[in-house]
Curated annotation (Swiss-Prot):
GO terms for molecular function: 4 iron, 4 sulfur cluster binding; carbon-carbon lyase activity; zinc ion binding. InterPro entries: ThiC, ThiC-associated_dom, ThiC/Bza_core_dom, ThiC/BzaA/B. It catalyses: 5-amino-1-(5-phospho-beta-D-ribosyl)imidazole + S-adenosyl-L-methionine = 4-amino-2-methyl-5-(phosphooxymethyl)pyrimidine + CO + 5'-deoxyadenosine + formate + L-methionine + 3 H(+). The lineage of its organism: Bacteria, Bacillati, Actinomycetota, Actinomycetes, Mycobacteriales. The gene is thiC. Its EC number is 4.1.99.17. This is Phosphomethylpyrimidine synthase. Pathway: Cofactor biosynthesis; thiamine diphosphate biosynthesis. Its cofactor is [4Fe-4S] cluster. It comes from Corynebacterium efficiens (strain DSM 44549 / YS-314 / AJ 12310 / JCM 11189 / NBRC 100395). Zn(2+) binds at H378, H442. Residues 1-58, 554-580 are annotated as: Disordered. Belongs to the ThiC family. Catalyzes the synthesis of the hydroxymethylpyrimidine phosphate (HMP-P) moiety of thiamine from aminoimidazole ribotide (AIR) in a radical S-adenosyl-L-methionine (SAM)-dependent reaction.
Length: 580
């Protein structure tokens, strides 16, 4: 694996864990010495992958592991069609920027085999992917296998996405975040979406969903998968809808099935499937303030009403399971009836669908297919935990994956904040992965800067939840920052930040000179009113005496007299907190 040279801070370096023939990426942060002695480098989780030419794609890390198991076969695959890239490609006669890099024949399971991580885990096998994850999470491989076997965690790793570095989603592990990218009919290009992918993983996205609905859907996805070190998710109904000219009523199982196989062959690791939207649940949304806000949910609701029958996703769910088991694609069972406003939170429609999703989870597990369950949405703080509790009850502890939730509806332009508040709360209560929200939510398609803001905000929420849950090692990062802050190691503070660039920029707005990076104050309080500097001076001047005052056996009168004596010494010495 080639380390990236373009680190986000000069104190960062690529420092992988090398064990059992694996190379598991981590970032090492070099720290300056403290007054009391040297500090060990600090190590953090790394998602960004190797730095390569996007036209070539990433190294195929997992190919030897996949083929060594002897349960997959190469095959020709479906025929590529122009409609795969949408109506504009049909008019042009080609995609706007064809993928010209390496594209081996697709793999799928041999007849009678299931090549999912859940199938291996249930058979008692610790795969290379599980070993990789265990090193990454600093846990025992058997613990990883056990959680995957029980369905409480998933390792989304399509056999046709060997470039991905294995990661795990489950509430017993680090809280993960997802970043959504993808074009629309209005804006963006393939190059821009690949750039967003690289930008999102640079700042810490654990998975990325390609939600493209515009031109070149197939080709955009090919570029993204070939350049992604993290699992890629999609909502295949979007592409299927494009294939029938955007008319939901014209969708069919045959069109959808073909689209799913197309995406399985490309290497999509998990797919959002809105199979829980049942005909009987749609009337429950009529009294809502904001109706059905999920794009996939509204598409399927429209189809159900047009045909007055259950959706083909529900009716053909078992066949979907059979397909997913051949490629190790995980279900992300979509919450098509999620609330789009506080007024609609935790209503009958939302929870009716969640209960059905729980039943579908059990059916998928019968095929050894990995599952996570999607959740809301817009939910007041006091109503959030009920979502965790019901999901764990009805979906038997399958990983919960939520969009926020937003805890207030009054802040367009700041919904990354309104949702991060809810995200931290729901993750603390057991949600395994958080889907980021950017400042553009409800307003427009996010650009690179919005992607970064969304990722950083959600890394913060996820980490706060890990600290609250007592996840091993989570607090160590905060403690390293606090120590650097108290010792005025400014460059270490920047290096330990989630976003060093912004931390440096804010500091340098008022104190840009290089000597300010070693000063024992900042512009907030200045040199005379810095509480930490005053605390340090007090420690330096009275450290031993303070320690003595805290020792057992010192009576109250002795303590009082000792304080008076030190007060006299301080006044006699000039009465200055700061001495030259």
């Amino acid at each position: 694996m080639t380390p990236t040279q373009n680190e986000i801070h000069p104190k960062h370096s690529y420092s992988p864990i090398r064990k059992h023939g694996l190379e598991v990426p981590e970032t090492e942060i070099a720290l300056d010495d403290s007054p009391s002695g040297p500090n060990e480098p600090f190590r953090i989780y790394r998602t960004r992958g190797p730095e390569t030419d996007p036209t070539l794609g990433l190294p195929r890390l997992r190919t030897p592991w996949i083929t060594a198991r002897g349960d997959v076969t190469e095959y020709t695959g479906r025929e590529r069609l122009l409609i795969d890239d949408g109506r504009s490609a049909m008019r042009r006669g080609q995609a706007s920027a064809e993928w010209k890099g390496q594209k081996p024949a697709p793999l799928k399971a041999l007849p009678g085999k299931r090549v999912t991580q859940m199938a291996y885990a249930r058979a008692g096998e610790i795969t290379r992917e599980m070993e990789f994850v265990a090193l990454r999470e600093h846990v025992d491989p058997e613990f990883v296998r056990s959680e995957v076997a029980r369905g409480r965690a998933i390792i989304p790793n399509n056999v046709n996405h060997p470039e991905s570095e294995p990661m795990i989603i489950g509430r017993k592990f680090l809280t993960k975040i997802n970043a959504n990218i993808g074009n629309s009919a209005v804006t963006s290009s393939i190059e821009e979406e690949v750039s967003k992918l690289q930008w999102a993983t640079r700042w810490g996205a654990d998975t990325v969903m390609d939600l493209s609905t515009g031109d070149d859907i197939h080709t955009t996805r090919e570029w993204i998968i070939r350049n992604s070190p993290v699992p890629i998710g999609t909502v295949p109904i979007y592409q299927a809808l494009e294939k029938v000219n955007g008319v939901a009523a014209d969708l069919s199982w045959e069109v959808f099935r073909d689209t799913v196989i197309e995406q399985c062959e490309q290497g999509v690791d998990y797919m959002t499937i809105h199979a829980g939207v049942l005909l009987a649940y749609i009337p429950l949304t009529t009294r809502r303030v904001t109706g059905i806000v999920s794009r996939g949910g509204s598409i399927m609701a429209g189809w159900c009403l047009a045909h007055h029958r259950e959706s083909f996703l529900f009716e053909h769910f078992d066949e979907l399971c059979e397909i997913f088991a051949q490629y190790d694609v995980a279900f992300s069972l979509g919450d098509g009836l999620r609330p789009g406003s506080l007024a609609d939170a935790n209503d009958a429609a939302q929870f009716a669908e969640l209960k059905t999703i729980g039943e579908l989870t059990q059916r998928a597990w019968e095929y050894d297919v990995q599952v996570m369950v999607e959740g809301p949405g817009h939910v007041p703080l006091n109503m959030i935990q009920e979502n965790n509790e019901l999901e764990q009850k009805w979906a038997a502890d399958a990983p919960f994956y939520t969009l926020g939730p937003l805890v207030t509806d009054i802040a367009p332009g700041y919904d990354h904040i309104t949702s991060a508040i809810g995200a931290a709360h729901i993750a603390m209560g057991g949600t395994a992965m958080l889907c980021y929200v950017t400042p553009k939510e409800h307003l427009g398609l996010p650009n690179r800067n919005d992607v970064k803001t969304g990722v950083i905000t959600y890394k913060l929420a996820a980490h706060a939840a890990d600290v609250a849950k007592g996840h091993p090692g989570a607090r160590a990062w905060d403690d390293a920052m606090s120590k650097a802050r108290f010792e005025f190691r400014w460059n270490d503070q920047f290096a330990l930040s989630l976003d060093p660039d912004t931390a440096i920029a804010y500091h340098d707005e008022t104190l840009p000179a290089e000597p300010a990076k070693t000063a024992h104050f900042c512009s907030m309080c200045g040199p005379k009113f810095c509480s930490m500097r005053i605390s340090q001076d007090i420690r330096d001047m009275f450290g031993e005496q303070i320690a003595e005052l805290g020792m057992p056996g010192v009576g109250a009168s002795d303590s009082t007299e000792g304080m008076k004596e030190k007060s006299r010494e301080f006044v006699a010495g000039g009465g200055e907190v700061y001495r030259e």
